[in-house]
Regions:
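Metal/cofactor-centered catalytic core regions of large enzymes
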Residues: 1-161
Length: 161
C-alpha cells in the first residue's frame, strides 16, 4: 500500500485509447490524451473531478514469482517483471482508503491495472522507480527486475543452513 505517489504513467483504456495519468500526492489528478477515443479521456477526467477518490492510488505491486502467463490479470500480476497499479479502496490490504471517503458508494472499488508485455504491448516500461529513505531505487527495467529487486528477492529466498 503506497503512502504517496508522484509522476505520470500511461493508461490503456481499451484496445485503441491511451492516456497519461498525472499523479500528485497519491491521487490521479487528470488524464492527458495520447491517442484513441478522446471522449474516454474526457469521461475519466469528469469522473475524477466529480469523485476524486476514484483516482486514489491504492496499490502498487510488482510481480515476484516465476510463472507462465495465464491470461487472468489476478494471477498474472504476480509474475516476475510485471507491475500493477490499483486505484480506489485499499482497506482490504491494510490501507486507509475506505468506502466512506468516496462521494458515491458505487465508486468505492479497487481497480487493478496490469502492465505486462502480453497485456500492454504498446506501453514500453523503461523503468519503475521507488524513493525509499531518500534514495531512488530502480525496481524494474523493460519488464525485467533490476538489480535492487533481484537483491531483495535473493535475500528473501536465502536459506540458512
Amino acid at each position: 500500500v503506497p503512502e504517496s505517489a508522484e509522476g505520470v504513467f500511461p493508461f490503456k483504456y481499451d484496445e485503441s485509447t491511451i492516456g497519461l495519468l498525472h499523479v500528485e500526492d497519491g491521487m490521479i489528478t487528470k488524464s492527458q490524451f495520447v491517442y484513441g477515443d478522446y471522449a474516454e479521456i474526457e469521461d475519466h477526467n469528469r469522473r475524477l473531478k466529480d469523485d476524486p477518490m476514484i483516482g486514489a492510488i491504492g496499490e502498487l505491486g510488482f510481480g515476484t514469482q516465476v510463472l507462465p502467463f495465464s491470461g487472468r490479470d489476478i494471477q498474472d500480476e504476480k509474475i516476475l517483471g510485471t507491475i500493477h497499479v490499483a486505484t480506489g479502496r485499499d482497506d482490504h490490504l491494510g490501507g486507509k482508503i475506505t468506502p466512506e471517503l468516496f462521494k458515491e458508494h458505487k465508486n468505492a472499488s479497487h481497480d487493478d491495472v496490469l502492465y505486462a508485455p502480453h497485456k500492454t504491448p504498446e506501453i514500453r516500461l523503461q523503468q519503475a522507480r521507488m524513493i525509499r529513505g531518500g534514495q531512488t531505487e530502480i525496481l524494474i527495467e523493460h519488464y525485467k527486475p533490476a538489480k535492487y529487486m533481484v537483491d531483495l528477492l535473493e535475500a528473501e529466498l536465502a536459506v540458512e543452513v
